[in-house]
Every structure is written in structure tokens, then in C-alpha cells.
């Protein structure tokens, strides 16, 4: 069961790199599908936003165990994937997230921190 997420958010393609951005997107979909087939992640979901004028154009959410997410994030392939993305998309960012059991643990920890701070 998933307990951790890896969220990648990106903005519009960098002007003049639209075609490259499209290719990087397609390669990323193959990369994540391969990891899912190999059992290295549980699943991934992609959302592309309608044109809004904002900084965010899309996001990808990868789900898995904390061990799976940490392993992927430390891999050479993932680092290269992010480097390619930074060359073609604006506002690219990656963050870990907590879901399901991981979220429950995080919120318990966070509540203790709040209680100690007050």
C-alpha cells in the first residue's frame, strides 16, 4: 500500500523548446510506465492543466512505499529525468508527499511538534 508520493510540478515550456518539451514528456511517460511494470512504484497519475495564465501547467504524482519512492528519487535515471525537464520546462519542482499510512504518521508527528511549540 502506498505511503509516500513523489510530486513533480512543471510550468509552460521554455520558449523555443516546445518540441523538446513534448519529447521529454513522452519519454517521462515511458519511464514511469516502465517503473510501474517492474514493480518499482505502485502507480503514477498525470494531470495537464488547461491554459490558465498561471505558473503551473501540469503535475505528475507517483505513489509507492517510502522505500520505493526513496530508491527512485536517488536513482541516476531520475536525476537525469529531472535535469532534462529543467532544460525544457519552467517552474519545475519535485517534492515528497505523504499519503495513506504515511500521512497518518506525519500528522501525528506534526501534532506533537505543534503542542510542544505552544
Per-segment meaning from a language model:
Residues 1-56, 64-74, 94-118:
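Short S/T/G/P-rich N-terminal loop/turn motif that feeds into the first structured element of a domain
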Residues 56-58, 88:
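Residues that flank catalytic or metal-binding motifs in active/ligand-binding sites
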Residues 61:
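Active-site scaffold segments
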Residues 75-79:
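A short linear boundary/processing microfeature
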Residues 80-98:
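Conserved short beta-strand edge segments in small beta-sheet-based binding/regulatory domains
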Amino acid at each position: 500500500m502506498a505511503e509516500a508520493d513523489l510530486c513533480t510540478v512543471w510550468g509552460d515550456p521554455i520558449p523555443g523548446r516546445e518540441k523538446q518539451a513534448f519529447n521529454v514528456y513522452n519519454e517521462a511517460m515511458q519511464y514511469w510506465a516502465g517503473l510501474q511494470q517492474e514493480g518499482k512504484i505502485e502507480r503514477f497519475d498525470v494531470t495537464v492543466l488547461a491554459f490558465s495564465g498561471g505558473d503551473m501547467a501540469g503535475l505528475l504524482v507517483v505513489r509507492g512505499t517510502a522505500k520505493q519512492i526513496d530508491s527512485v528519487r536517488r536513482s541516476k535515471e531520475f536525476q537525469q529525468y529531472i535535469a532534462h525537464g529543467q532544460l525544457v520546462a519552467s517552474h519545475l519542482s519535485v517534492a515528497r508527499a505523504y499519503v495513506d499510512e504515511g500521512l497518518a504518521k506525519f500528522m501525528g508527528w506534526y501534532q506533537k511538534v505543534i503542542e510542544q511549540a505552544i
